[in-house]
Amino acid sequence: MILIDSHPQHDWLVGAVEKRLREELAKRTVEINEEKSKIVDLAKGGSFTFLGFEYRRILGRNQQWRPYYAPKLKKRTALLAKLKEIFRQNISQPVEGVIEQINPILRGWVNYFAVGASSECFSFVRDWVEKKVRGHLMRARERSGLGWKRWRTKWLYEKLGLYHDYRLRRLWSLRKVQPAPTVP
């Protein structure tokens, strides 16, 4: 993935970058797959997917255009299908065992997609998982509903140990390491 500014004065860069890329790859006896390679103009509303993320350009709060990348809907759907299968296979098992199985999957998926604009997707996944756990608990007690009055959300995460670290990791928010002071 190579990103180039869309300003008209940089139009010559597209050809130059492609030429240089072909030269460098030829040194390593690697060729560009023309079927998989494409040039996308994000300034004209284009978007592309790469490594499970969808990339496009949006207008930010400060009225400046900025890149936007979030998990693909297909990846979220695949995660939910996998979790649904675990709930289905363990329908008569205690909820603690189900949570032990889904927590590593959730942790890995969230850690991978914890960059970019993933909070809306994380919120959906968290709500979906919470409803499935509540439904599992109610089914074990042969009751209908989701037990909103019976169990507080805090109880699900603290007592049962349901995965709850759906925070985004922003690279720019990490503290910069200060160099060690030099002694004269």
What role is predicted for each listed range?
Residues 1-184:
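Non-catalytic terminal/accessory segments
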